[in-house]
Amino acid sequence: MIQVSICSSIGKLTASVGLLIKALSSKTSQVLVGWKVIDKNSKVKIILTIEVNNQGRIFVITGPSGVGKSTLVKALLDHFKEQLFYSISATTRKKRISEKEGIDYFFKDKDEFENLIKQDAFIEWACYNNHYYGTLKSQAEQAIKSGINLMLEIEYQGALQVKSKYPHNVVLIFIKPPSMQELLKRLKKRNDEDETTIKKRLEQAKIEFQQIDNFKYVVTNKEFDKTLNELKSILLSEFI
């Protein structure tokens, strides 16, 4: 427990307390749990009792397929090695040539994934383009309880589920392309999906854009270095 005292005239007290409470409520590591007021010699003294809670924060990166999320997340994890823990998602999607089990994803078949859903093994899961994606509860909740900041790269449905479950711990960040034409170009450049799949991804992107208002930060990935620097600034501001 920590106690903070503010002693001021009535006129200044309201503004002081308002600013302090706003600052406290913006940081999950500090929770206002009680207060009392003492009136003495025409001054008002307010004593705030604060409980320190060292839970980690959950940084959720999402955005349409092909926007560059994975490359940005890897760069952020490399830069913030001591401050971020990456939670590896599970998926039923087919493994790409460049991907490795247990590093990029935990690859599951449909029956295995659905059994994990029945066991309540995920903090979030969603079906995206006919494939399941989910974040395993075991590693995620252990990191949060230990005070470790968690980085998730997940689909927008999952992002909203995490926000609903951990409203005071979550920072939602949406990565968007500069244009649909550029997104199409990037999807084709990957050269690992047919035209039908690419078309579905573009349609899905339009649906995702409708959810942007649910995200605290929206970052346009036009130039990688500029986007990365913007994300670094966002994370640094949230760490403080």
UniProtKB/Swiss-Prot annotation:
Q: Which cysteines are joined by disulfide bonds?
A: none
User: Where's the Guanylate kinase-like domain?
Assistant: 56-236
> Its Enzyme Commission number?
2.7.4.8
Q: Give the EC class as a word.
A: transferase
Q: What's an example GO cellular component term for this entry?
A: cytosol
Which keywords annotate this record?
A: ATP-binding, Cytoplasm, Kinase, Nucleotide-binding, Transferase
Q: What is this protein called?
A: Guanylate kinase
* Gene name linked to the record: gmk
